[in-house]
Amino acid sequence: MAKLTVKDVELKGKKVLVRVDFNVPVKDGVITNDNRITAALPTIKYILEQGGRAILFSHLGRVKEEADKEGKSLAPVAADLAAKLGQDVKFIPGVTRGAELEAAVNALEDGQVLLVENTRFEDVDGKKESKNDPELGKYWASLGDGIFVNDAFGTAHRAHASNVGISANVEKAVAGFLLENEIAYIQEAVENPERPFVAILGGSKVSDKIGVIENLLEKADKVLIGGGMTYTFFKAQGIEIGNSLVEEDKLDVAKALLEKSNGKLILPVDSKEANAFADYTEVKYTEGEAVDPGFLGLDIGPKSIAKFDEALTGAKTVVWNGPMGVFENPDFQAGTIGVMDAIVKQPGVKSIIGGGDSAAAAINLGYADKFSWISTGGGASMELLEGKELPGLAALTEK
């Protein structure tokens, strides 16, 4: 990576500003999945071990008005982080700027940590965080000693005050270990893969992944399509899809992608269908691609799993983004499980999950430790797979 990293700067005695991604699910004040906190620990610990004073920034959820602050405080995160680090994490509830925060920052000693309250609390008054308000970025930068570490891959595709804004106002803006690893795994897989390179794309909408499909058709040897967007591709070919999800305004796009794919684009050949999305009374497999009238496809079928298994045989690089079906429902998770099985059994394969629902599927279904890398950022990984430059990365200091 052509950007400076946290190992390239002197940290001892310095107040080091760190953008982490602590946007974790919180229910009734309890964190239900702490993976993102765990993922940030190597960078935080390194700063503390080097004698730095870590000042952490993160958002949590969306905050547009005062009422949205309810349940969005980073207080539970501060407690969880303190337990993981085995030391106190200083935190002032509700405070993102002002004399109280400045006093707490200036009182930090070497090896100590402070977590600033949810950066999106600044969005209540004019979206200052999300719109990268110059004054806010400059203010937050002033809290440190000229060093900013961006370790939040999950927001690297956004230009916010807490990443791009701070970067513009410090002497050195560098990458943390998580950001460095995310870029290395995903960019390397797409730009310089060991072949055969197979990409697997699922999820519900073609519209979300047009750019990704176009880029991967150029870079990958095969692109497998599953999930709800299958049926837009089916309908584009005149195949009956019953009541399945379809994007009518993307039929021409789907048809064009198929025509220019030179056979690289591989679609399912059967589905598991039900007579309703939720309160269904009948579930069955289709004979072929066509979905029966009154039914909708909610997973790929056994013939498709076998076809994808064959397509993955011998693969040395696999990038997967998007489940094959409604994996949250046990009736429609066989396709996602079948594809995961097909990926992880390949000898010596570098297997990468591009965050989002695919990551949730791997974690919830017990496959997390079988993949080479699971990205912490769905949107950011999608933009990397599309070949786009990430603002949060572009803002870092060149080596």
Curated annotation (Swiss-Prot):
Protein residues bound to substrate: 21-23, 36, 59-62, 120, 158
Keyword Membrane: no
SUPFAM superfamilies: Phosphoglycerate kinase
Gene3D superfamilies linked: Phosphoglycerate kinase, N-terminal domain (3.40.50.1260)
GO MF, any single term: ATP binding
Binding site residues for ATP: 209, 297, 328, 355-358
Reaction it catalyzes: (2R)-3-phosphoglycerate + ATP = (2R)-3-phospho-glyceroyl phosphate + ADP
Record EC number: 2.7.2.3
Pathway noted in the entry: Carbohydrate degradation; glycolysis; pyruvate from D-glyceraldehyde 3-phosphate: step 2/5
One of the record's GO cellular component terms: cytosol
One record GO biological process: glycolytic process
Compartments, as annotated in UniProt: Cytoplasm
Superkingdom of origin: Bacteria
Keywords: ATP-binding, Cytoplasm, Glycolysis, Kinase, Nucleotide-binding, Transferase
Keyword Transferase: yes
Record text on subunit structure and interactions: Monomer.
HAMAP family found in the cross-reference section: Phosphoglyc_kinase (MF_00145)
Family: Belongs to the phosphoglycerate kinase family.
Protein name as catalogued: Phosphoglycerate kinase
